[in-house]
UniProtKB/Swiss-Prot annotation:
Organism of derivation: Rhodopirellula baltica (strain DSM 10527 / NCIMB 13988 / SH1)
Superkingdom assignment: Bacteria
Needed co-factor(s): (R)-lipoate
Function according to Swiss-Prot or TrEMBL: The glycine cleavage system catalyzes the degradation of glycine. The H protein shuttles the methylamine group of glycine from the P protein to the T protein.
UniProt entry tagged with the keyword Metal-binding: no
Protein name per its UniProtKB record: Glycine cleavage system H protein
Keywords annotated in UniProt: Lipoyl
Entry's Gene Ontology BP terms: glycine decarboxylation via glycine cleavage system
Note on how the cofactor is bound: Binds 1 lipoyl cofactor covalently.
Cited InterPro entries: 2-oxoA_DH_lipoyl-BS, Biotin_lipoyl, GCV_H, GCV_H/Fam206, GCV_H_sub, Single_hybrid_motif
Keyword Thylakoid: no
Subunit structure as annotated in this protein's UniProt entry: The glycine cleavage system is composed of four proteins: P, T, L and H.
Length: 132
């Protein structure tokens, strides 16, 4: 199932969030936006968290490195990491083509509601156009 960027929520730090309910629990799949991938350009390395790690909103959980810069990745949600996209670090070029499907980074079992600071697509596009 392809993710529609217009249905996702976004952090100011360019992570996207796709929330799904499974068996009464809520899970958030998290990745970085196409805008962030474009700005970083030529990705060379990504550091991912371990499954089982507990994250708080705003906590750094990894980093992505390009030939231009090293950028931390921040958790836009609170919860436990239940899955990590282990194929991603070896296939970073695919992020340029598919930041929203292949480009997912981790899946978190939510321990709290989504923060109100997460933006909808229109607000995120506005932030990107002002930054771009």
């Amino acid at each position: 199932m392809a993710r529609d960027p217009s249905t996702l929520r976004y952090a100011e730090t360019h992570e996207w969030v796709d929330v799904q309910e499974e068996g009464g629990d809520k899970f958030a799949t998290i990745g970085i936006s196409a805008f962030a991938v474009e700005q970083l350009n030529d990705l060379v390395y990504m550091d991912l968290p371990e499954v089982g790690r507990t994250l708080e909103v705003g906590e750094e959980f990894g980093e992505v490195e390009s030939v231009k810069a090293v950028s931390p990745l921040y958790s836009p949600v609170a919860g436990e990491v239940v899955a990590v996209h282990t194929d991603l670090p070896d296939n970073l070029d695919n992020l340029n083509d598919d930041a929203f499907d292949f480009g997912w980074i981790l899946k978190v079992k939510l321990s709290a509601d989504l923060p109100e600071t997460l933006m909808d697509f229109a607000a995120y596009q506005k932030q990107c156009s002002e930054a771009g």
